[in-house]
A protein has these predicted regions:
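Bacterial N-terminal signal peptides
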Residues: 1-5
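Hydrophobic small-molecule pocket/channel-lining residues, especially in calycin-type beta-barrels
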Residues: 6-163
């Protein structure tokens, strides 16, 4: 009897992460990005057999008309072999920036991700604030002189239930 030339990979067990579970649900995101105030809606849910937390971010319908529209899908997962979080960003800026994955480690109530983009490193930190039940997303990039600068500093609060 001949054995098949390949074997079907089995899906890993569901990824259970109590920390990431805090992000499940609907959120209101506000804060500065590149000197302008952002007003976004965020929805997070487990997808793909609980292998990823899909985070859908988009400009809120109630945002000022002057705000530049933005939309992104973030996929947060965990690589148990490498013992690190993985963050994949897909957004309106296209495929060039989606080529780079962010890798992160959890420290206390934060996950600090490093993205090594072709034009320089970029940091994204997700910080859970248990005392208020909110999140902070801090995004930083290096300027031309090699100094870290804030790109965005967002606060996420639970969205009010829709009437």
């Amino acid at each position: 009897m001949l054995a098949p030339a390949y074997t079907v990979a089995q899906a890993p067990p569901e990824w259970k992460d109590d920390f990431a579970d805090h992000m499940i649900g609907a959120w209101t995101l506000t804060g500065p990005v590149m000197g302008h105030e952002a007003h976004h809606e965020v929805q997070a849910e487990w997808v793909l057999n609980y292998q990823f937390l899909r985070i859908h971010e988009k400009t809120a319908a109630s945002a000022p008309a002057s705000e530049r529209p933005y939309e992104a899908l973030w996929f947060l997962g965990y690589d148990a072999i490498s013992e690190r979080y993985v963050l994949h960003l897909l957004d309106v800026f296209g495929a060039r920036y989606s080529e780079t994955l962010g890798y992160g480690a959890r420290e206390g109530n934060s996950i600090h991700f490093v993205f090594e983009y072709p034009d320089g490193p970029f940091h994204t930190t997700y910080r859970w604030l248990p005392e208020t039940g909110a999140w902070q997303w801090l995004l930083e990039q290096k300027d031309k002189d090699g100094k870290w600068m804030k790109f965005a500093d967002f606060k996420l609060t639970r969205a009010s239930p829709k009437q």
